[in-house]
């Protein structure tokens, strides 16, 4: 999509910087990775995701794309339309999308905002029916494979594994985890004088690493 931006070897100074890093990572990854499913996550407790999602939608539009911003529920989509009237024609909820849209919408990039385990079936159906790119912002799909039969669990794990994390920033008890496309995963250790890079990994570490 665009020329890759050098990846910093330190954590962003503030949330505004992290948000810009996320936008650049998404734009850099579109067309640069083989996956049609990109995930971007800012995992801060109490984060107001709506304005971040709307600004990402605007950044995608400014880059020449025609995104459809999808919220799982109608109430959140209605609030987004009120907050960003300039984007209201691009904002839908899952039911509106699944019920049928204009033919051209089916080829647009989908920006799905925070799908939860309870949205799993609807979201998977939307993704599998969509021929274009899907960008998932702050999704929580991993928990959708818990508490179901083994066959369904394996199918869901396969769907979860189909996503490429182009951006990830997560505070940890003793540090932080970050990935900015196209770089590796970076683990930071929290020291008395700040955060220091502790190492890099080619894939996301699990909770036991």
Tell me what each language-model feature is.
Residues 61-62, 82-88, 104, 124-131:
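Short, surface-exposed basic-aromatic patches at helix termini and helix-loop junctions that form
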Residues 100-102, 113-116, 125-126:
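Conserved mixed alpha/beta catalytic, RNA-binding, or beta-rich assembly cores of soluble enzyme
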Residues 21-24, 71-107:
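A short, well-structured beta->alpha microelement
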Residues 52-56, 121-126:
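A short acidic, amphipathic alpha-helical/loop segment
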Residues 145-209:
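A conserved mid-domain beta-alpha-beta active-site/ligand-binding segment of alpha/beta enzyme cores
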């Amino acid at each position: 999509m665009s020329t890759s931006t050098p990846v910093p070897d330190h954590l962003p100074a503030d949330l505004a910087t992290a948000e810009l890093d996320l936008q650049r990572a998404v734009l850099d990854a579109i067309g640069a990775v083989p996956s049609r499913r990109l995930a971007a996550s800012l995992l801060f407790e109490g984060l107001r995701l709506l304005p971040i999602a709307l600004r990402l939608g605007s950044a995608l539009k400014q880059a020449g794309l025609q995104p459809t911003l999808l919220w799982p529920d109608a109430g959140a989509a209605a609030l987004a339309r009120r907050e960003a009237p300039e984007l209201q024609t691009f904002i839908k909820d899952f039911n509106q999308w699944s019920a049928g849209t204009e033919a051209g919408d089916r080829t647009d990039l989908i920006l799905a905002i925070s799908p939860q385990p309870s949205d799993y079936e609807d979201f998977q159906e939307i993704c599998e029916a969509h021929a274009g790119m899907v960008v998932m912002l702050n999704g929580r799909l991993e928990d959708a494979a818990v508490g179901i039969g083994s066959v369904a669990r394996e199918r869901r794990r396969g769907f979860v594994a189909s996503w490429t994390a182009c951006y990830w920033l997560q505070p940890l008890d003793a540090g932080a985890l970050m990935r900015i496309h196209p770089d590796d995963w970076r683990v930071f250790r929290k020291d008395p004088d700040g955060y220091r890079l502790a190492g890099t990994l080619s894939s996301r570490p699990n909770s036991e690493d």
